Amino acid sequence: MAGHPNTDNVERAARLDTTALSDALDRLGIAGQCLGIKPLDPNFRLAGRAFTILYGPSASPSGTVGDYIDDVEPGGIVVLDNGGRADATVWGDILTWVAHERRVGGTVIDGACRDTHLARQLSYPVYSRSYSMRTGKDRVQVEALGGTVNIGDARCGAGDILRGDADGVIVIPRAHENAVLDAAEEIDKIEDEIRRAVQDGISLRDARARHGYHSLQTRKK
């Protein structure tokens, strides 16, 4: 399928479920599934480009957990790599409130957040590996902004597209976004055709066979 140079790819991603995007990534041999990263609320949705932050252990003298939120553009997705740590949170109520006020698109954390009630109250999308009450101050600090980070089993660079829904989060690498979105749109279309075929009286087995359902995600050679 051809690319869509006149269509914003974030909007294209927002129209797709993470399941179709995951199958497209499998087909292309790209590891973009952020396994283990879940929404605080299954109704949360996000789609936007990544603003990446890497955390490390607190040094002496201690650095800070970061004031980067002032630099995140509206619609951007804050992506925090804290190495999956559950013992030191890197996102809380002040950041949630400021991000919501500034129309940031959401937050994705390989690690823990806290003050989860406010994210739910404001319907501000937060996806994380865990949550806790324990602060990250004096335990972790920002090491780098704008680099490539790890989120679950995926690598995420600044400007990559993230798409989140009730099933989790997908990273769409910037270098491959047209190919991934084209494949996901094709998969989504075929699944709709299967549903219509069943509505018309065809058996699910025959509808799936007709449209190659069982190999939609198979890597192309």
Q: For the regions a protein language model found, what residue spans apply to each?
A:
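Feature captures the catalytic cores and cofactor-binding loops of soluble hydro-lyases/lyases
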Residues: 1-158, 172-221
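C-terminal binding/interaction regions
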Residues: 162
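Beta-strand-loop-alpha-helix segment that lines the small-molecule cofactor/substrate pocket
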Residues: 165
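Channel- or pocket-lining gating/hinge segments that regulate access to a cavity or pore
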Residues: 168-170
